[in-house]
Each structure stands twice: as C-alpha cells, then as structure tokens.
Amino acid sequence: MRQKLFPRVERNLSVFGENLKAARLRRKLSMEQVAERAGLSRSTISAMERGSASVSIGSYLQFLFVLGLDEDILKMAADDILGRKLQDAELLSGRRAPKRKNRGRTA
C-alpha cells in the first residue's frame, strides 16, 4: 500500500526534485552520468527528479554527493527554533526530565 503524504510534504518533495534536476543540468551532467557515478539506475534518478517518496534517503544523498551538495543535508533541522523554544519553556517552568533508572550499573 502506498503511503499517503501530506500535501505540503508532496510539494516539498516535488520542489526538491526540481532543484536536483536544475543542479544536475547546471553541471551539464546527463541522468546516465549521475546514475553511473552514484551507483543508481537511471530510473531512480528520474524518480528523484520527480520528487518520489519511494526512493531511499540514502539514494538522495548519493545523488547530492555526485553534485557536490551532500553536506547541505546537514543544514536540515540544524537550527531547530521551535524545539529550542519548547526546551527553553520547559527550563523556565522548572520541570525536569524524569530520572533514568540505574539498571544495576555503578558509575
């Protein structure tokens, strides 16, 4: 059964695929060249450029690596503004995370 994605996620994947294609074309690389260098099939490259959700993140990273853009993935969620606000609010409220049980180990 195919996974149902949120519309925004589908749009983001589609834009991501378009960006991959544009980056490939700017480098004057064919799908076949990228596929060979990434160790993927041409049909997988085509699916990624269409923003397919069925392609593994590892394959997307291989594609990015061939384009010299693989480190850009590290920027994702690096500045988690909402998460930091939630963490700060928890610290201000004085609540602490529950203690972990010591499972017979000594420090």
Question: What would you call each of these model-derived segments?
Answer:
Residues 24, 35, 64:
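The alpha-helix within a helix-turn-helix
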Residues 2-26:
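A short, Lys/Arg-rich alpha-helix, primarily the initiator
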Residues 18, 28-30, 55:
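Residue-level signal for the short linker/turn that defines the boundary of a DNA-recognition helix
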Residues 28-46:
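Short alpha-helical DNA-recognition segment
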Residues 52-65:
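Short, basic-rich loop-to-helix N-cap that marks the start of a DNA-contacting helix
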Residues 74-107:
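Short, charged recognition helix plus adjacent turn
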